[in-house]
Amino acid sequence: MAYILEYINHEFNGAIRDGNFYDLGSGIGKPVIAMSLLHHFKKLIGIEYLDNLFNYSLGIKQNYENYIEERFRKNKDLFNFQKPNSTDFLHGNFLEQNWEDTSIIFANSTCFSENMMNNIAKKANKECKSGTIIITFTKRLTTLNAEWELRDGFRRIMTWGVATIYIHRRK
C-alpha cells in the first residue's frame, strides 16, 4: 500500500491531500488500517459484505485504535505527523453505499467477477467526481466511460503472489 500511495502522490502531485479512502470488500480491514498510518485522510472506510470478515475487522479496528492512542499519548514528540483519523467499517454491499465523497477507492479485485467489475465501473461513472482514483488488483475496469483514464498497470509482489495494479483516474 505504501508503494501505491507514493506512486499516486508522485503521479498526481499530491492530488489526494485531505481526501477520503474507501476499500470495497475490505475483508478484515488491513488496507484501511495501513492507509490510516500512511496518509492523513479525512475519512477511511472499509465496506465488507461477509459477516465473519466484517466482525473480525471490528476487533482489529478496536485493537488498532487502542494501540495508536497509547503510542501517541506516550510518545507524542516522536511523531512528525498528525494522529490518524478514525477508521470506520460498514457491513453491507459496497454497491449500495454512496461514493460521491471518495478520493481513492481501493478494490483487491482479484476474485471479483466480470459482472462485479462492470457494476463497480457503472457506479463510479455515476457517482465519482473529477480527480477520483480507483485502484484495482489483477483486473482493470474496462467499462468506465471516456471521462476516466487508465494511468498505469504495474506488477508488484504481494504476500500471496504477484498482482497487476491498475490505477484509474477520473479526468
Identify the meaning behind each predicted range.
Residues M1-R17, N55-W99:
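S-adenosyl-L-methionine
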Residues P31, N52-Y56:
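Conserved short alpha-helix immediately C-terminal to the canonical SAM/SAH-binding motif I
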Residues K43-E48:
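Conserved SAM-binding motif I beta-strand of class I
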Residues T102-N115:
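A short SAM/SAH-binding and catalytic strip from SAM-dependent methyltransferases
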Residues F112-K171:
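C-terminal substrate-binding/active-site "lid" region of AdoMet-derived donor-dependent transferases
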Residues D18-G27:
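Conserved class I S-adenosyl-L-methionine
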